[in-house]
């Protein structure tokens, strides 16, 4: 569960390394984001020469959470870290590569480009 002020690792090569959540999109009083949800965040750490800079406000989709997600068959998928991928307004990733595994739930949320770029889909 990602909420306001949560810090996430960035799982792409857009130039950002860490994000701070500003808002969870979807509904007026929504508090938590899970895998596949879109957040508004600011870049807290960035690598030199990247597409995004420190202080930029970006949209991102959550691809890994420590709290995990429940599947329809009753199983759970859980990761070691909270991570997100920075996206454009048309839901395509800003970077050209995705690092680390992503959850299968992204396929249900129509993030097919992220799923196809990911090295592993769990």
UniProtKB/Swiss-Prot annotation:
Name by which UniProt lists this protein: Large ribosomal subunit protein uL14
Keywords: Ribonucleoprotein, Ribosomal protein, RNA-binding, rRNA-binding
Function: Binds to 23S rRNA. Forms part of two intersubunit bridges in the 70S ribosome.
InterPro entries in the cross-refs: Ribosomal_uL14 (IPR000218), Ribosomal_uL14_bac-type (IPR005745), Ribosomal_uL14_CS (IPR019972), Ribosomal_uL14_sf (IPR036853)
Assembly mode: Part of the 50S ribosomal subunit. Forms a cluster with proteins L3 and L19. In the 70S ribosome, L14 and L19 interact and together make contacts with the 16S rRNA in bridges B5 and B8.
A single cellular component GO annotation: cytosolic large ribosomal subunit
Organism: Bacillus cytotoxicus (strain DSM 22905 / CIP 110041 / 391-98 / NVH 391-98)
Family matches, as SMART domains: Ribosomal_L14 (SM01374)
HAMAP family attached to this UniProt entry: Ribosomal_uL14 (MF_01367)
CDD domains referenced in this protein's UniProt entry, alphabetically: Ribosomal_uL14 (cd00337)
Alphabetized Pfam families for the sequence: Ribosomal_L14
Family under the similarity heading: Belongs to the universal ribosomal protein uL14 family.
NCBIfam families: rplN_bact (TIGR01067)
Gene Ontology molecular-function annotations: large ribosomal subunit rRNA binding; structural constituent of ribosome
Biological-process GO terms, alphabetical: translation
């Amino acid at each position: 569960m990602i909420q306001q002020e949560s810090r996430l690792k960035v799982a792409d090569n857009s130039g950002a390394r860490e994000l701070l959540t500003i808002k969870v999109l979807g509904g007026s009083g929504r508090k938590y984001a899970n895998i596949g949800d879109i957040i508004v965040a600011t870049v807290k750490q960035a690598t030199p020469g990247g597409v995004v800079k420190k202080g930029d406000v970006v949209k991102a989709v959550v691809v890994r959470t420590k709290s995990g997600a429940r599947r329809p068959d009753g199983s759970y998928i859980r990761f070691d870290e909270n991570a997100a991928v920075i996206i454009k307004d048309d839901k395509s990733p800003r970077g050209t590569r995705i690092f680390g595994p992503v959850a299968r739930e992204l396929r249900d949320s129509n993030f097919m480009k992220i799923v196809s770029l990911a090295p592993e889909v769990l």
